[in-house]
């Protein structure tokens, strides 16, 4: 997929880059798989901001994605490759032989006309197929990995993401994530073969503030530009710094301090990500 540049008709367009849409099929989405999600804009049920720098953004419809991939024994044909406003990878519309249609994440190399299937075992190792981890050969690249059998894929779903199956141990398999982390996952969990497509997403330049506003991202004010009552970095004469190590608005260390809480799943992490 090619990176697209724009002529600088205005100063804001000079550095903008985007992704070409040549891989997208020119046909409307399946209406039965579209649903309207409420825009919370970072507010809770009381209307108070619980997640800063968020807004509704441009209007969009959510595509219902089949993350579970448990339609066993029925082959499907890729009918279309579509844009999804809620995620940074493309999605593929699968038309199954029994007449049902579902969306899945498009892995790299999957195109219109390809045949995909899901089963517990016995499928070809090709992009788009899905099997239980215990039946996938060691060394295979996978994505959309479940953490609990039957719950649906929770890991490795964004553009260009992948993991490699490194080994098998009784009821667990060992995955190496793109970050370098090695972790165990239950062997009964499902996973899709291949790497998530649209890997060029990481190389685009947003280029202007308005483009982030369309995505629902509001501006972020520096703490040093606030008053002392609003932020630990606030106050002072001119652009004077706060004289302390960088902290969040609530006084917790930032810029590298570890904030991850201990949880029961820590025992499944064999080695942490690179450099950590």
From Swiss-Prot:
Residues 211-276 are annotated as: Disordered. Keywords: Ribonucleoprotein, Ribosomal protein, RNA-binding, rRNA-binding. The keyword Ribonucleoprotein applies. The keyword Cell division does not apply. InterPro entries: NA-bd_OB-fold (IPR012340), Rib_uL2_dom2 (IPR014722), Ribosomal_uL2 (IPR002171), Ribosomal_uL2_bac/org-type (IPR005880), Ribosomal_uL2_C (IPR022669), Ribosomal_uL2_CS (IPR022671), Ribosomal_uL2_dom3 (IPR014726), Ribosomal_uL2_RNA-bd_dom (IPR022666). It comes from the Bacteria. GO terms for cellular component: large ribosomal subunit. Belongs to the universal ribosomal protein uL2 family. HAMAP family: Ribosomal_uL2_B. Part of the 50S ribosomal subunit. Forms a bridge to the 30S subunit in the 70S ribosome. This is Large ribosomal subunit protein uL2. The lineage of its organism: Bacteria, Pseudomonadati, Campylobacterota, Epsilonproteobacteria, Campylobacterales. The gene is rplB.
């Amino acid at each position: 997929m090619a990176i697209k540049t724009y002529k600088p008709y205005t100063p804001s367009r000079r550095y903008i880059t985007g992704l070409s849409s040549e891989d997208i099929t020119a046909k409307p989405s399946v209406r039965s798989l579209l649903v309207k999600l409420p825009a919370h804009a970072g507010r809770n049920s009381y209307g108070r901001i619980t997640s800063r720098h968020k807004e509704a953004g441009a209007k969009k419809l959510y595509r219902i994605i089949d993350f579970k991939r448990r339609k066993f024994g029925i082959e499907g044909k890729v009918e279309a490759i579509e844009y999804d406003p809620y995620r940074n990878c493309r999605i593929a519309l699968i038309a199954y032989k029994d007449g049902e249609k579902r969306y899945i994440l498009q892995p790299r190399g999957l195109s219109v006309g390809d045949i995909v299937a899901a089963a517990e075992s016995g499928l070809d190792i090709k992009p788009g197929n899905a099997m239980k981890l215990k039946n996938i050969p060691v060394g295979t690249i996978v994505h959309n990995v479940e953490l609990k059998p039957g719950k649906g894929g929770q890991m490795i779903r964004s553009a260009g993401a992948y993991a490699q199956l490194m080994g098998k141990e009784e009821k667990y398999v060992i995955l190496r994530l793109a970050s370098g982390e090695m972790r165990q996952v239950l062997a009964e969990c499902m996973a899709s073969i291949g790497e998530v497509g649209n890997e060029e997403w990481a190389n685009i330049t947003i280029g202007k503030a308005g483009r982030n506003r369309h995505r629902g991202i509001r501006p972020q004010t520096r703490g040093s530009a606030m008053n002392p009552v609003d932020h630990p970095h606030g106050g002072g004469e001119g652009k004077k710094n706060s004289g302390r190590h960088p902290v969040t608005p609530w006084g917790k260390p930032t810029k590298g301090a570890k904030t991850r809480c201990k949880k029961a799943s820590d025992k499944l992490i064999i080695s942490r990500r690179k450099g950590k």
